[in-house]
Amino acid sequence: ELKRLIRELNANGIECILDVVFNHTAEGNELGPCFSFKGFDNNIYYMLTPEGFYYNFSGCGNVLNCNHPVVRRFITDCLRHWAVEYRVDGFRFDLASILGRDQNGAPMENPPILEALAFDSILGDMKLIAEAWDAGGLYQVGSFPSWNRWAEWNGRYRDDMRSFLKGDSGVAGRAITRITGSSDMYDPA
């Protein structure tokens, strides 16, 4: 049914962007249940502190180790499946800044997973949209590693326009800034 829905949407000029979450799982922290990745190889799939606790840049108790080759392959295979089998037009990545952290949680200059997705032969024409921040304080709006392929989800646009449309006072100036390209966040060049 979903494949048919996407075909019909596309036939009517509507693109389908799939919201994906590759930053955490439902397994929680070290006290959480073992559904899948903890059982496969906890040390590969999750970012762990030297003491064996889970980093929590997602606010959900754990963080996937997205730049490990095994996890990188898993993410790429999942996205390729949705692109080939379902023909989605792109992906919006929840808390995408997590995908730019190394196994110790440090931000990387050229994260392998983000670069791999940007240049993947199957995903090459797909829209890639990053929610360019995470719950650990890494805020990359305006500076997300993109290789001229990644777009950024503008959360301030969402928040300011919502306030404006609700009729909140004092937000007209912010709404104008958002409508005209968020020059306070992005280099106009």
Residue ranges and their predicted role:
Residues E1-R87, R92-F119, L138, M185:
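Substrate-binding/active-site clefts of carbohydrate-active enzymes
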